[in-house]
Amino acid sequence: MAEETGALPSRTDFSAWYNEVIRRADIMDVRYPVKGLYVWYPFGFALRNHTYTLLRSLLNRDHEETLFPLLIPETEFMKEAEHIKGFEDEVYWVTHGGLSPLDVKLALRPTSETAIYPMYALWVRSHADLPLKLYQVVNTFRYETKHTRPLIRLREITSFMESHTVHTDWDDANKQVEYELGLATEFYRDLGVPIIISRRPDWDKFPGADFTMAIDAVMPDGRTLQIGTVHHLGDHFSTTYNITYEDVNGEQKLASQTCFGISERCIAAIIAVHGDDKGLVLPATVAPTQVVIIPIIVGKRGDEIMAAVEKLESELKAAGLRVKTDARDMRPGAKYYHWELHGVPLRVELGPRDLDNNQLVCANRLGVKTTIPRENAADSVKRLLDEAHDQILEKAEDHLSSHLKTVKTVDECNQSLEENIVIVHWCGEKACADKLEELTNSSLLGTGVRSKYVVDDEGPCIVCGKPGKTALVGRSY
């Protein structure tokens, strides 16, 4: 965590920039001696905690938090054949307790359906028990064989929020799907991250789901990052695990279910979507430090300035802001570099001239400078933080809209995919999707697109020319 100076790689080389900013901005240390497992630095973990506090505050309106075990007996894990087929080559198995072989192998959860649903079968008895809406934030393990990358592709996902709900029927579960998509939209708006929602094609849906709705963000290089999913499970798992209830007529009915997940990819999205060549650009909603105060010590007025700084810090903290004063014995420029690298939303400078004029000089992370009166500083600072959030959201929206391209031919699709998500029409046939993916080295992301920048309409399929509907094509992390 030693301070480094010098410029970061340009963000136009996104991979190099991302790896370097993760390290130099104290997010994660990648040197742990197991591939795909990383260590949170305290600063990165604080960012993670503020982000998940925000997520929990939204979930707690409609869910209750719980915690299920990490280990899943093979007997329960193997009950759901279709589900397991989607994970079987990624599972870590515990085969011994000490030196003794276990009678039943234990899986480290890749996801928790097979841990949670046997318990739901015990808990749900009557329609009065429904809906049941629980979530947990846990670590999960998947034996990734692809190239691993901090926060994006991991073998240990350290912060997986998974919601699991149970409902009386398919329609009520579908309302929950819509609710959770709305929750995710609000969450990412609070992070300043614009998203695109679409329905994944059937061959790419969650194993065992009726359908999957996916939430994608656009990275600086035009690739997509899946940063959330909501799955309508129908009665698939309730059939396997016998999750039934007695309805108002005294009849036994199978329940319908949903699940919803967001991992620490939400942190990757914050870093990637907002960052610049100076480092992180953090939204004030989750920044570990929202305001840094820089004393400008000139001449013999140091004690007077520091007294004013301490008073200002106390006032801002009393207003509920996360504030630090950087009183280190170093040039102001070096301090600016440090706090810009770490993405602090607002810098407040206080020197002799500001003291004499009863003012504060403020600069937000995008470089917008403002002078505010010292009186009622907390109100002014909060307003500037709100304005800074609006500015980074607008910048991110501009990036998203500029990286969406509508095309009519496969050749146009191929050319546009270098830096964009491509909007096409597709007939719905897997053969056409397979051909398009093969010719363009891309993935058909989904249909039923929800974005203010995408018109969900009809047109001739880009491959066969038959009637089709709007679909997204992209290259993904």
From Swiss-Prot:
Q: Where in the cell is it found?
A: Cytoplasm
Record SMART domains: ProRS-C_1
Q: Name one GO biological process term.
A: prolyl-tRNA aminoacylation
Q: Disulfide bonds, which pairs?
A: none
Tell me which EC number(s) this protein carries: 6.1.1.15
Q: Cellular component GO terms, alphabetically?
A: aminoacyl-tRNA synthetase multienzyme complex; cytoplasm
Q: Which UniProt keywords apply?
A: Aminoacyl-tRNA synthetase, ATP-binding, Cytoplasm, Ligase, Nucleotide-binding, Protein biosynthesis
> Assembly and partners?
Homodimer.
Please describe what this protein does. Catalyzes the attachment of proline to tRNA(Pro) in a two-step reaction: proline is first activated by ATP to form Pro-AMP and then transferred to the acceptor end of tRNA(Pro).
Q: What is known of its domains?
A: Consists of three domains: the N-terminal catalytic domain, the anticodon-binding domain and the C-terminal extension.
What protein does this entry describe? Proline--tRNA ligase
What is the species listed in this Swiss-Prot or TrEMBL entry?
A: Methanocorpusculum labreanum (strain ATCC 43576 / DSM 4855 / Z)
Organism lineage string: Archaea, Methanobacteriati, Methanobacteriota, Stenosarchaea group, Methanomicrobia
* Gene of this entry: proS
